[in-house]
Amino acid sequence: MSRKCEICGKGPSFGNNVSHANNKTRTTWYPNLQKVKAVRNGSVQTIKVCTRCIRSGHVTKAI
């Protein structure tokens, strides 16, 4: 299971946590993915979508 949005392709980003003492430790930030039942190609499928795509209306939710 990949941590990637199936609509826009947004995935994890990498960087450093930096303390006040300027110590750096590697970290990973993951997108806010939700499992949504959506209509794709005329059928209902469960897909993982980021909240940005849900809010902007790129996903047609199944009722």
Swiss-Prot record:
Entry GO MF terms: structural constituent of ribosome
Gene3D superfamilies the record matches: 2.20.150.30, Ribosomal protein L28/L24 (2.30.170.40)
Xref: InterPro entries: Bacterial_rp_bL28, Ribosomal_bL28, Ribosomal_bL28/bL31-like_sf, Ribosomal_bL28_bact-type, Ribosomal_bL28_sf
Pfam families associated with the record: Ribosomal_L28
Keywords: Ribonucleoprotein, Ribosomal protein
Chain coiled-coil ranges: none
GO biological process, one term: translation
GO cellular component: ribonucleoprotein complex; ribosome
Family: Belongs to the bacterial ribosomal protein bL28 family.
Entry-linked PANTHER family: 50S RIBOSOMAL PROTEIN L28, LARGE RIBOSOMAL SUBUNIT PROTEIN BL28A
Name this polypeptide is given: Large ribosomal subunit protein bL28
Source organism phylogeny: Bacteria, Pseudomonadati, Thermodesulfobacteriota, Desulfuromonadia, Geobacterales
